[in-house]
Amino acid sequence: MRVSAVLSRGAAPSELVDAELDDPRSDEVIVRIEAVGVCHTDLVTRQRLGERPAVLGHEGCGTVEHLGSAVTGLAVGDRVVVSFASCGGCDQCRAGLPGYCAWATALNGSGRRLDGSPTIRVRGEPVFGSFFGQSSFATAALADARSCVPVGDVSPEVVAPLGCGFLTGAGAVLNVLRPRHGDRLLVIGGGGVGSVAALTALSEGVEVVVAEPVLARRTLPERCGATVVASLDEPMPSVTHVLDTTGRPESIARALALLQPCGVLALVGLGPAEVSLDVWALMTRGLRIRGCVEGDADPALLIPDLIRRYQRGLLPLDRLVTTYPLADLDRAVADQRAGLTTKPVLLPGG
């Protein structure tokens, strides 16, 4: 199937190119992409791949166009959010924790199917694709049917980021930290993940503090009831829970210092591989540190729940999103880095 796709190659400008999708296998579908979020993981992967040509994108939303022969539960014409890939059969998948799938790295980050076959070609040559089981910086994506969550009649640009970034922020609060009404949560970083985490916690009656240096990213959480600070060095009360979206060692150290005894720190940010910790403080204050992938979420369960919260006015996801044409990936990334947008979303038709 011929599609238009955004091809990335190291530091070179992205380009919109003609590409060829492989035919769907029995457990795959082709989704006509209507919107796709830009996530920090796309940028990290682009840097990691160096000069290797790649079609990235892993927060796709669109309409199912073709079904593999064994696909059930989906129909042509269904609007779906395409989330991360998982095998469905390992211990973690069966336990409802597909983010920790035994095959997660191969399925989401190898650039090919599990058997090593490519899913997308440019100028006749295979390129890095099947990113998070989709590679949705394109007008259509070949996706694992298991990754597709039907969402009904909702705005694609609003729900597309639920495939990863928004899912991670909300899931970290609801599934991992689980603060109770009246607890105090510190969210470090007010990007897409942090903002949704803050909004989710506020909807649960939790007191929220957001630490974010960019003024524009502090505005919405503050209007929704959060206390906002520009820096962790500003005076603030102790907290029961912390969500760090930055991965910075200095932020993690400050988070641990601010936690009340028996408090919990959840980590969702990609940072340096090593961080120094005061083991004595962890032990004597009963502190817990918890890693978190994809919000410990089962997308098929949490995505519909978050959409219902949005529709009830509890999660103003639309106010986080700025849209761009598909070809303007680099401008969207530049705007995000400059603090001009919280969550850029690309529109293949716009």
Task: Give short role names for the model-derived ranges.
Residues 1-3, 253, 300-350:
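C-terminal hydrophobic helical "lid"/dimerization subdomain
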Residues 22-36, 46-94, 99, 152-154:
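Glycine-rich beta-strand-centered segment in the early N-terminal region that forms part
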Residues 65, 209, 266:
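Conserved beta-strand positions in the Rossmann-like core of class I SAM-dependent methyltransferases
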Residues 84-146:
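Cysteine-cluster motifs in flexible loop/terminal segments that predominantly coordinate metals
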Residues 139, 146-148, 152-232:
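Mid-domain Rossmann-like dinucleotide-binding core that forms the NAD(H)/NADP(H) cofactor-binding site
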Residues 234-242:
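A short acidic, Gly/Pro-enriched loop at the edge of an enzyme's catalytic core
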Residues 249-314, 348-350:
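Glycine-rich phosphate-binding loop and adjacent beta-alpha segment
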